[in-house]
Amino acid sequence: CQNTCPANVEIPLYVDSVYHGEYQNAYSIIQRENPLPTICGRICTHICETMCNRRVKVDEPVSIRALKRYACDKIVEAGEEFPVPAVAPANGKRIAVVGSGPSGLSCAYYLCLNGYDVTVYESKKELGGALYYGIPAYRLPKELLARELDVYRKMGIKFVTEKALGKDFTIESLRADGFDAIFLGLGAQLGKIPPMGNSSVSGVMSALEFLREVAAKEAPDITG
């Protein structure tokens, strides 16, 4: 299972921690290779389960993703905070990350762990990119995304919202502000509409556009 996981998370270790009720430890184990444990506990495609030894040798695989979610949910239910990893001493280097989606957040997380001073720029009002604007709340509650982002803030990562590349700042202006390097995690935000008749009429929109409007509480009236 671990070798099949794209992040190579130490699945046997965190499953054992869940078994013993050590939920904080389980979160920390996941967090070493995956900086978004709570989010992935709800939306990852759990391909690790396809190669679970129990599935191969007995009958059904261990519900690995569900156990990840369970560990995170138990921390929340207990009124506890998610564990914050220790970061390396500051190395004096400043990094700008443009985009607060999964790519930008992962980049910011690991840079901060290694002592870099990281600032994340987001063009929209809310942080998370597709995590906030592309995934419905019934799959990924906004409050859980906010809790995960609190870990980043406690690590020392800074966030700047409603500032867009090419409009409010440029690569050159970031360099002039003293950033030593810039990471662009802009996402793939254009939706597709199938080639069919009347697809260009008013009111027809892509699924991504509709989800963004729902998340921003600007969804069109679809009653009828």
Residue ranges and their predicted role:
Residues N8-H20, Y27-I30, P61-R65, V97-K167, ...:
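Beta1-alpha1 glycine-rich phosphate/pyrophosphate-binding loop at the start
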Residues F179-G187:
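Short hydrophobic core segments
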